[in-house]
């Protein structure tokens, strides 16, 4: 497994779509899509044909890493690359009257070496035509690109694409596909946050992680006035090929993507990740080890949420551990899962550059029976906010063998809140700190004599008021140590209850402590289940250092 940076240029990219490889699978015919930039040969296209293409490709050797780019593109700095802009006058659907959506393309360059092919599809005739690269589609501004090196290189392709929605048809994008199989979307804040991927392979194994690539896209021409469009994608890597269909709904307050993928394994795969997502968690209320900045919290997502196949709701706050952690939460036909950013209060972040309070949540809703497997979560240590250190995906229980065909259907919701939530009481926040003393009586003369770690979990909603306070019973399970000084406190400002306990070690072990808690009333669960992983300090660190200077 490699530590990853979001959309990093070193991701393995596979060359799959030679001109003959794609065009030979579709017959030529006439073309009438509303695009004035599509200039390639006219070919017939449909999703069934794309599936056949991916299946045939899986029987051939992988094409390997992409070739080098012209020097003027390969040596671009991030600042220079970002200064290259697509010319909105050449947008994909500029010929569609009353269009609500439009497409622009990303330039290849810097770390984006994959030459991705783009096609415009006429939805009436099912005819497609390629859009070839040419310098006049872009504004190079101060990038310092020597465009004479690019003349006649129509096979350069593009790095990716982004989607714009009226009334911001050329100013603020709402969907972006860029780098390997990464893609993102926004809610009504127009603030990007976490990312999704087409597929994850061997994320946490003893081998090298593999990053499949989307190597070609086909865009159904959007209808006038429509805020939904369909794009198809061909995925390729050393281990697998895939045919993807995305039906993308660009709604007022959220983006919803219906995803259908058909996967064809080239070789045995140790770990396959379905509906993977990548996020960042540096510090928060529960984890402040590296929070030595002016910002109280720094994260794209604050929790993993799961709606299990048996109906149980899970809240698992994210961590920034000192050592890489991988956890697999077993399930059978999950109802949904996602990485959520539910804390939307600016004062909790104080960030006017990255606006973490505006970042969207991402919820996965399976649209078919996924069977047995696990929601897998990997957390990587990070010192700041530039590393995407959280990865989550569904891992099927059944081993993937060469020649296998798999189909997964799911829906992605990019929104401030997930589309569903538990009817029970929900975890609002998790806080940790010094323990070993009665709440409200932290001693001022000296630190507590015995070391302990305090946990405070805030619950809101559900039937808490009907049960509270005497009938609320916290059910706490620990993999090691003891929970003492358990308290149930009503918190008027958020009209909920805080469950507080101190964790005391019973051994010198520094192994992670798995914690589990839910609230019960008269034998029935009245809250979702809180899961947490705590990392005890070494025995010689289990003391409080008094650094006061008394004169």
Swiss-Prot record:
GO CC, alphabetical: outer membrane-bounded periplasmic space
Main localization, broad class: periplasm
GO biological process: beta-glucan biosynthetic process
Keywords on record: Periplasm, Signal
Signal peptide residues on this chain, from the entry's feature table: 1-32
GO MF assignments: carbohydrate binding; catalytic activity
Annotated Pfam families: MdoG
Gene3D superfamilies referenced in this protein's UniProt entry, alphabetically: 2.70.98.10, Immunoglobulins (2.60.40.10)
Keyword Chloroplast part of the UniProt annotation: no
Record InterPro entries: Gal_mutarotase_sf_dom, GH-type_carb-bd, Glucan_biosyn_MdoD, Glucan_biosyn_MdoG/MdoD, Glucan_biosyn_MdoG_C, Ig-like_fold, Ig_E-set, TAT_signal
Pathway(s) this gene product operates in, as recorded in its UniProt entry: Glycan metabolism; osmoregulated periplasmic glucan (OPG) biosynthesis
Modification after translation: Predicted to be exported by the Tat system. The position of the signal peptide cleavage has not been experimentally proven.
Disulfide-bonded cysteines: none
Any coiled-coil regions, as ranges: none
Family statement drawn from the similarity comment of this UniProt entry: Belongs to the OpgD/OpgG family.
Function: Probably involved in the control of the structural glucose backbone of osmoregulated periplasmic glucans (OPGs).
NCBIfam families, alphabetized: TAT_signal_seq
Name of this chain's protein: Glucans biosynthesis protein D
Taxonomic lineage of the native organism: Bacteria, Pseudomonadati, Pseudomonadota, Gammaproteobacteria, Enterobacterales
